[in-house]
From Swiss-Prot:
GO terms for molecular function: ATP binding; cytidine kinase activity; uridine kinase activity. The gene is udk. The keyword NAD does not apply. Belongs to the uridine kinase family. It is found in: Cytoplasm. It comes from Pectobacterium atrosepticum (strain SCRI 1043 / ATCC BAA-672). The lineage of its organism: Bacteria, Pseudomonadati, Pseudomonadota, Gammaproteobacteria, Enterobacterales. SUPFAM superfamilies: P-loop containing nucleoside triphosphate hydrolases (SSF52540). This is Uridine kinase.
Amino acid sequence: MTDQSHQCVIIGISGASASGKSLISSTLYRELRDQVGDQHIGVISEDSYYKDQSHLTMEERVKTNYDHPSSMDHSLLIKHLQMLKSGQAIEVPQYSYVEHTRKQETVHIELKKVIILEGILLLTDARLRNEMNFSIFVDTPLDICLLRRMRRDVNERGRSMDSVMEQYQKTVRPMFLQFIEPSKQYADIIVPRGGKNRIAIDILKAKISQFFE
């Protein structure tokens, strides 16, 4: 059993790509950090744990299906969560969507009372679910997610609208229907309407605040 002084609460936030997961995660982090201090709460993105592809050619890397569970290094993520729970610091990998592989640098994270973990495939892995104290699924209509994703990938990741649409049709939507949507059944809380659902955010804040008492 984990020593009381080293307890780290893991809260999983999942949902479709561009559903509002990151907005909810960042809002919760920012508002709770202002209450308790950043030494007590942190955020980890599942995106940081895409598998290293430095051994592949660029031609091979660009074919990666980022919406399939096999693209994730969940074993490393689970190891890192267990390290945090045992009081150890971790080095979170960083991923380059331009190079389609991990960067050289990492982000150092010390033990926190609460870690907010966000990502599209979190609830698809039973091992990962077992590491969470509770989980949230952000339930946003796919057409809204597509519009948000197109804006994000064109503006922030330098992609063309045609390539974003092609990826959506070939992998994003099929993988959502095959893996992500079915994982909703494992969520403890379902949040409709994405990251601007203020009532849901306030309820989640109240729930998470209990872990700081």
